[in-house]
């Protein structure tokens, strides 16, 4: 059920789905990890049951005027960890979601940077991922990830 996924203690040892995703519009940097099960996903078939994604949301560091700082590499400079979001998939997990907010068999959880449960309802996650439909397995940057995998 939504909200029941715990933050895996070892997720920082997992492969990165995508690293340093830049969100200048939100002044955020995101690190997205995927468990070893998720690495077995395919562009044609999506991600298998047992897949878990962990997304760390960092505030970008800002200057005195509130402008996001950019490093020598041209990327936003990571500041404090704001939130940790989880997305997990297993057979039947998504059935408890309200009608109109079902994202296949995915469930969601959100935590504050300090590890406490976040107040955001999972409906916000579901609403955001909804447009990605089954063809993208409700996962953002699906094509970007599989394009990166194919080019290796």
Name what the model sees in each region.
Residues 1-3:
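N-terminal low-complexity, Pro/Thr/Ser-rich intrinsically disordered segments
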Residues 28-43, 67-72:
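N-terminal post-signal-peptidase region of extra-cytosolic proteins
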